[in-house]
Curated annotation (Swiss-Prot):
Induction: Up-regulated by auxin application. Belongs to the auxin efflux carrier (TC 2.A.69.2) family. Involved in cellular auxin homeostasis by regulating auxin metabolism. Regulates intracellular auxin accumulation at the endoplasmic reticulum and thus auxin availability for nuclear auxin signaling. PANTHER family: PROTEIN PIN-LIKES 2 (PTHR31419), PROTEIN PIN-LIKES 6 (PTHR31419:SF1). This is Protein PIN-LIKES 6. Expressed in seedlings, rosette and cauline leaves, stems and flowers.
Length: 431
């Protein structure tokens, strides 16, 4: 009996899939293995943070998060994107940032519909829209692609080319995600006049959600004196001292630039990963600097090689930190079971099919590079990811960090299963 079952399983592995030429179980293996690797490393991080081992206490996880987002992730993006990008490729990749914007718009519309049906507790209507509408287009896709490309049997061919192309595509869209996060999301998380929680108003800038990246908060919150006004010293000040017309004009121009810098929140947008992406695109698009920095044997290739070595450490470090952050559990939340479940279903079940439709239409219209399956796979992944982790830092700044932490916890738990299912579908469609 056991022999017959094993024989049947072996036969099923050889059965071709209708959408492609692979086997049923083979396709499932390709899609599930990266998720299994991610889950294993997160579990080890959870174990290291447990009270029985306690190698990753909260202070250690905070330092690890800071190291990842301030050094390791920018190094990975700079080395991989710089090697892959050219001016011609940047023109071919124009739909990647457009896809991020379309994904945010479509996700927000779905979030609005879900919130209108579920009616979350006041004042979490806009909060629910954002939790459904804005996905993680950075570190989680990078982790999944790294795990997928390491497998020599991956459907995208050569492991090194798979990794470089995938990282380049994902990194190319990150700068748009950062702008969306610190403009649209920041405004949508604006608290009501009475605040999300009157008792915690004074603590809103002092605590972090368990899944937030602590190193991001200094980019959002400044340690100003209590009597400091955000517009202080930004507008022209009338002085009794005589000054020339030229000095006055220069001073006003400088003050206008400073005012715009603060008003547009450029300090929040210009994060290390975004700076690395912009530098890689500029230096990689210019033939002279590309040959000088990113080509094997180039005079400055030692710098790129050093970034590659540091970048290789990003994946395990971020997964250990993410697993360690889960040790505290979801925490308390005022959203309730119905709203939390609606966010999970909206983000992981309703958003991906709409994203699949967007990518399919773009492909039919000829907006995507011909015969580049990795390009299409990355576009689909952008619609499949759980809620953005960095939105937790913005939510914390706005006073709803506790609710955001609870949502991030449950969404990432269920995303382990949903991402595997959607990846099976995508691989069958593409191959």
């Amino acid at each position: 009996m056991i022999a017959r079952i094993l024989a049947a399983l072996a036969d099923s592995m050889e059965m071709p899939v209708a959408a492609g030429g692979g086997s049923v179980l083979g396709t499932i293996k390709i899609a599930v293995m990266p998720i299994a690797k991610v889950f294993t490393m997160c579990f080890l991080g959870l174990l290291m943070a447990s009270k029985y081992v306690n190698i990753l206490p909260p202070s250690g996880r905070k330092l690890l998060n800071g190291l990842v987002f301030s050094l390791l992730l920018p190094c990975l993006i700079f080395s991989q994107l710089g090697q892959a990008v050219t001016l011609q490729k940047m023109l071919q990749w124009w739909f990647i940032p457009v896809n991020v914007v379309l994904g945010t718009i479509s996700g927000s519309i779905i979030g609005f519909i879900v919130a209108s049906i579920v009616r979350p507790p006041y004042p979490y209507f806009k909060f629910t829209i954002i939790q459904i509408g804005v996905g993680n287009i950075g570190n989680v896709p990078l982790v999944l692609l790294a795990a997928l490309c390491r497998d020599t049997s991956n459907p995208f061919g050569d492991s090194e080319k798979c990794s470089i192309d995938g990282t380049a595509y994902i990194s190319f869209g990150q700068w748009v995600g950062a702008i969306i996060l610190y403009t649209y999301v920041y405004q949508m998380f604006a608290p009501p006049p009475e605040g999300f929680d009157a008792e915690e108003e004074n603590l809103a800038l002092k605590t972090l959600p368990v899944d937030a990246a602590p190193e991001q908060v200094p980019l959002l919150t400044q340690n100003f004196p209590k009597d400091f006004s955000p517009t202080q010293d930004l507008l022209p000040v009338q002085s009794t001292e005589p000054r020339g017309r030229g000095v006055s004009r220069k001073g006003k121009i400088a003050q206008i630039f400073v005012f715009l810098y603060e008003k547009l929140k450029l300090k929040q947008i210009v994060q290390p990963a975004i700076v690395a992406s912009i530098l890689a695109m500029i230096l990689g698009a210019i033939p002279f600097t590309k040959k000088l920095i990113f080509t094997n044997g180039a005079p400055l290739f030692f710098f790129t090689d050093s970034c590659m070595i540091l970048g290789d450490a990003m994946i395990p470090c971020i997964l250990l930190a993410l697993g360690g952050n889960l040790i505290n559990g979801p925490g308390s939340s005022k959203l309730g079971f119905k709203t939390t479940a609606a966010i999970i279903i909206g983000r992981l079940v309703l958003v991906p099919p709409v994203g699949l439709g967007i990518v399919t239409v773009a492909d039919k219209l000829g907006f995507l590079p011909a015969d580049d399956k990795m390009f299409r796979f990355v576009l689909l992944l952008q619609h499949t990811m759980p809620t953005s982790v960095l939105s937790g830092a913005v939510a914390n700044l706005r006073g709803c960090g506790r609710e955001s932490a609870a949502v991030l916890f449950w969404v990432h738990i269920f995303a382990i299963f949903s991402m595997a299912g959607w990846m099976v579908l995508y691989i069958n469609i593409l191959f």
